[in-house]
Amino acid sequence: VEGPVAAALGALFRRRWVLAGGKPVAEGTMGEGCWPDGLAADFTDVDVGIARTEPEMPDQVPVHESEALFLAQIAGAKRHLYIESQYFASRKIAEAVARRLDEADGPEIVIINPVTAQGWLEPIAMDTARARLMTALGRRDGHQRLRMYHPHTAGGEAIYCHAKILIADDQVFRLGSSNVNNRSLRLDTECDLAIRARDAATAAGIAAIRDGLLAEHLGVEPAVVTATIAETGSLIETIERLRGEGKTLKPYEVPDLTSVEAWLADNEVLDPEGPDEMFESFSKRGLFRRWHRLRGGRS
């Protein structure tokens, strides 16, 4: 980005640098025409929103803009919601998805995730919570509008999805550092950018990015994805038609959890929603403590 949004990001980064213990950095001068040669801009003359996450600290008021933006974007999608994320472990985000799945004419929701989180601890925290949430969402998906997929190479090797992207219809494009898990949306320091289409050119650009991402995952040309979406009106049907042998997207399969893994997931032991919950008793919190209130007692 360049222009006023770049200046705003610079101010944000300088402040965070000092909060992290760095020495103050002087503000640079605004340069004109600093866009790299040979790099075509996807969008020009658009308003860019900045959403932040900053945890509560003794000298800092918490900021949960990134989470609030996720919830608003999920609630506002009309036909299609496309998400790429390293994790899917936030109860609040899952609840927002569940509300859309309950609607008779809600949007399709496609989530791209890695097969498993990296490291030895993150799979225990993230994969188990994802399994519990996807199981619960599957029970709510009576209209069959939710799918999760994993990207794979032509040789069948899983590709680790590290992206943080949300595209709602051809109207909203969001990217940044926020993952769909409690730690990212409540405890970490994050920053996301988002644009909303206010003209046909911007809407076409947003759709082109979505179609290009799907084409990359499916090993086909973007024009094939665009044409198939136009024919079917469905992201899910498009993926199902185009995925096959070679580079492709494979559906998520809910794993069987051990009793310990299920307990860890249900109690959010390794992915608390805030500093206070790191020390809160397990009886007062858990993955589904508000889920049942949302369901209104439905089985």
Report each predicted region and the residues it spans:
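Charged, low-complexity intrinsically disordered terminal segments
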Residues: 1-299
